[in-house]
């Protein structure tokens, strides 16, 4: 899980790749849960929240860049 301060230091491309990586990880966790291989189901929730956090910071970054132009 990455912290908000670490995410805010990344540029737009870095944030987009972070979101994609988190979504892939979340998909893998969902498949593990479906096949009953996942023992710690709280990782699903934390991954989902990390995705939301990264998307929020991505949107904020895009708005800031638009305001600077």
From Swiss-Prot:
Q: Is Ribonucleoprotein there in the keyword field?
A: yes
Query: Which cysteine pairs are joined by S-S bonds?
Result: none
Keyword Ribosomal protein among record annotations: yes
UniProt cross-references to Pfam families, sorted A to Z: Ribosomal_L29
- Superkingdom of this entry's organism? Bacteria
Q: Which UniProt keywords apply?
A: Ribonucleoprotein, Ribosomal protein
Q: Which CDD domains does this entry report, sorted A to Z?
A: Ribosomal_L29_HIP
GO cellular-component terms in the record?
cytosolic large ribosomal subunit
Q: Which GO terms describe its biological process?
A: translation
In alphabetical order, the GO MF annotations are: structural constituent of ribosome
Name the family the entry cites. Belongs to the universal ribosomal protein uL29 family.
Which HAMAP family does the UniProt record give? Ribosomal_uL29
Output this protein's name: Large ribosomal subunit protein uL29
């Amino acid at each position: 899980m990455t912290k908000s301060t670490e995410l805010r230091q990344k540029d737009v491309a870095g944030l987009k790749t972070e979101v994609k990586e988190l979504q892939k990880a979340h998909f893998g966790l969902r498949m593990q849960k479906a096949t009953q291989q996942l023992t710690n189901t709280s990782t699903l929730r934390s991954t989902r929240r990390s995705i939301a956090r990264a998307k929020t910071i991505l949107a904020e970054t895009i708005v800031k860049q638009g305001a600077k132009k």
